[in-house]
Structure formats: structure tokens, C-alpha cells
């Protein structure tokens, strides 16, 4: 039996995606609020920096693990304000999260040129060479087979298309590491319990962050999927990093 990590637990490979889906379905209604509380609002600045890596909004963009739609909505609003002709496809394996994203696009009148697809990052239902950009924010560490997802990203991008990933990473400064670990393992699950009633979901969150590859390890994984000009930029001392690469 093929076992992989689900947080600090070992589970059968075939069961991980269902467990991850359950985590996000259980916290979907409080997801945005928890992001604000856990990061003290910093996640909004990280995402703003992330979308600045997409200079050409006259593009077809695939946002994978779109969740509640933060990245896609920022891109859609920016394109509308600039008068750009953007086409956005939001993809997530969790239907509850995608429903929340769709509701937000309607509430903000940003639903033009947006498509929604319930799909796995490991098996994207799109033809080869379809997109100018592939974006994924705080999602790839939840994918059971990250290498397979990276290869799928490479497949669906057009030649010269850009892969961009925002993900929790490894704090670089030694003086900050101990506090960050205490905050992650002691405070975040407690906040999760108070706000969502689901402490276990946020225990999984911090455990999955702890187990995610380092910046340099993930850079190598992206390169091995076929991407060129692969690099990353640390934000907030390495709490998160933006990774990118091109299909050449």
C-alpha cells in the first residue's frame, strides 16, 4: 500500500485527496476570515506581490486550487480597471470552495470572462498548450502528488507560458524560527478552534507547511518538471515564497 503524508499522519495515497477535501469543506465559510486572522492580513500583501508577477493581463490565465478566488478576483479587477481583455479559468477540486469563489465574483460584478472547473491539479481537463499563465496560491502542498501536478502545469501552458506559485516556505532567520514555530503549532490551531470549531483542520495546515519542501528543494522539483529560468523570492523572511518558471 502506498502511504503519503497527511500532515504528520501517514495515509493511503488514494485517501489523501478526500481528507484534504473534507478539511476545506469544513472551514469554507470561515476561510477568508481565518486567513486574515492567522496572517494579520499579510496574506493580502503577499497576494498583491504575487499578481504583480503577471504583467500582461491580455492573457488566458489558469488559477489552480483557486479556493475562494482571491487571486482570480484580484486579477479580474485589475484587468477591468486597466481595460484589459483577460480570460480566467478558476479550478479547484473542492466544490464548496469554488461555490464561494463564484458567489464573490457575482457580488463584485467580476464574472465576465471567468470559467469555473471542479478538477484535480494532477489531472487537468484542458488541452496541451492552452494557457499563458498558470497560477497556484497556497494550494500545491495539499496535492497528493506534487510532481504530477507540476508536470500537468507544464503540459497545459503554452510555449513561453509562465508558472507562478505562492506557497508557505521555510523561515530563514534563526532568531524568528522558534517564535514562528510556537505561533504555528500553538496559536493557529487555537484560533481555528475558536473561529471554525475545527482545530484539526488547522493542525493539518501547520503540519503540511512544516513538511513542505524548502525553497531550494521545490525549485529543483519545478525544474525537473521541465521548466526553465526557475527561481523564487522570499517574502516576510521566508514565511512564504513566490516560485516561478517558464515553459520554453
From Swiss-Prot:
- What EC number(s) has UniProt assigned to this enzyme? 2.1.1.163, 2.1.1.201
Keyword Cell wall biogenesis/degradation belongs to the record: no
The pathway entry for this protein reads as: Quinol/quinone metabolism; menaquinone biosynthesis; menaquinol from 1,4-dihydroxy-2-naphthoate: step 2/2; Cofactor biosynthesis; ubiquinone biosynthesis
Would I find Transferase among this entry's keywords? yes
| Single annotated GO MF | 2-methoxy-6-polyprenyl-1,4-benzoquinol methyltransferase activity
- What are the protein's UniProt keywords? Menaquinone biosynthesis, Methyltransferase, S-adenosyl-L-methionine, Transferase, Ubiquinone biosynthesis
InterPro entries, alphabetized: SAM-dependent_MTases_sf (IPR029063), UbiE/COQ5_MeTrFase (IPR004033), UbiE/COQ5_MeTrFase_CS (IPR023576)
Enzymatic reactions: a 2-demethylmenaquinol + S-adenosyl-L-methionine = a menaquinol + S-adenosyl-L-homocysteine + H(+); a 2-methoxy-6-(all-trans-polyprenyl)benzene-1,4-diol + S-adenosyl-L-methionine = a 5-methoxy-2-methyl-3-(all-trans-polyprenyl)benzene-1,4-diol + S-adenosyl-L-homocysteine + H(+)
Transmembrane region positions?
A: none
Binding residues for S-adenosyl-L-methionine: 68, 92
Q: Which GO terms describe its biological process?
A: aerobic respiration; menaquinone biosynthetic process; methylation
User: So what does this one do?
Assistant: Methyltransferase required for the conversion of demethylmenaquinol (DMKH2) to menaquinol (MKH2) and the conversion of 2-polyprenyl-6-methoxy-1,4-benzoquinol (DDMQH2) to 2-polyprenyl-3-methyl-6-methoxy-1,4-benzoquinol (DMQH2).
Q: Which family does it belong to?
A: Belongs to the class I-like SAM-binding methyltransferase superfamily. MenG/UbiE family.
NCBIfam families, A to Z = MenG_MenH_UbiE (TIGR01934), PRK00216.1-3 (NF001242), PRK00216.1-5 (NF001244)
Protein name per the record? Ubiquinone/menaquinone biosynthesis C-methyltransferase UbiE
Task: Tell me the organism's taxonomic lineage.
Answer: Bacteria, Pseudomonadati, Pseudomonadota, Alphaproteobacteria, Rickettsiales
